[in-house]
Amino acid sequence: MQPALQPTLYESLEALPEGVTGEILNGQLHTHPRPSGAYVNVGSMLGAELICPFRKGNGGPGGWWVIDEPEIHFVRNVEVAVPDLAGWRRERMPYFPEDQRFEVVPDWICEILSPSTAGRDREIKMPLYAYYEVRYIWLIDPAKRTLEAYRLEAGTCIETGRFADADRVTAPPFGAVSLDLEIFWPPQRPVWASMPLS
């Protein structure tokens, strides 16, 4: 009798239950649950702000695809990342893949940090993105209300800007427009709203 074959990492990733995101980073399967509402809000707001000027060309140069949570295969079925947002210049990726696997390295990636993903995003994914030559990386921390912008230079991520609270963001590769950072942050819950009812 033949021993049962162990599933590949990618087969394990595909078998994850709904609501769990999986990535294969440096040969290990990493999982995390769906994010909180505040975290999702930041990604939605950033995508909305970028789509008109950079995808549609309304008030900006156009020429980009900006996509939420694409499954990026740096190495098909072996090195798989799912960033919160990613962008490609259309001349580099004129068409979408026929399945879920994006195999063209993005020009830009944005990770939205949460307590469960911040360490992985900074310590595993940023070096991986640099290795595969993602030219621009943004890290947004909803809890700290910050945005950090990085550019790849000679294989190293160099910080090009740090923004907080109500700053206006003008950062590569989307420096053609100024983004109002304040609209990304959800309203603060009043203290009384968290108090138990008597």
Each model region followed by its residue ranges:
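Gly/Pro/Ser/Thr-rich low-complexity, intrinsically disordered segments predominantly at protein N-termini
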Residues: 1-198
